[in-house]
Amino acid sequence: YYRETNSMRTIKNLLQDECRLGIVRYAAEYDRKYKDFFESKGFLYELITEFRPVLLFGADSSLARKETVSLSNLAEKIELAYADPYVPSVPAGEIKKKELPERLRRIVLFDRSSLLELLSHNPDTFVCTSPVSEDLRRRYGLISRTLAEPSKQHREVLLYRGDYKLTEFDRAFLTEL
């Protein structure tokens, strides 16, 4: 089975032996801090993917009519964001300020299914997230666009304890990712 959670909880679950594998997502600029932390805890890690976030919004959104979306187009929209401002050895307040800059309207969510439902039912919402499959976009009636302004590179990393050996099933799972 799998459990959707945030980076800090994923790390805690691995440390407490509640799971064998975890996936952690972070901005590439923090790569060294994360790797140092992983190594200090005896974790092994493998890069799954690197990506630049994309904008995702409902097909009924006014943004859907634009080929290029800029930050100014988002001013009157409601941002949906994940509540995961964790970076090892950096104060949470500093990360929150940098990763979630002040906006007039933001809804902070924990799970992806709630986020997808909100996007599909509220044309005033958007999220800046990892690329989403065509199947998922079609299922929820969503549109994806690249933000006109440059965005930060992000990484998704598989994480597991140093004493754990990946199984054939684990490898098959990673191939599917």
Task: Annotate each PLM feature.
Residues 1-6, 101-112:
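Short beta-strand-to-loop elements that line the ligand-binding cleft
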Residues 37-53, 57-79:
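Flexible hinge/capping segments at coil-to-helix
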Residues 56-63, 155-166:
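A bilobed periplasmic-binding-protein/Venus flytrap-type ligand-binding module shared by bacterial periplasmic
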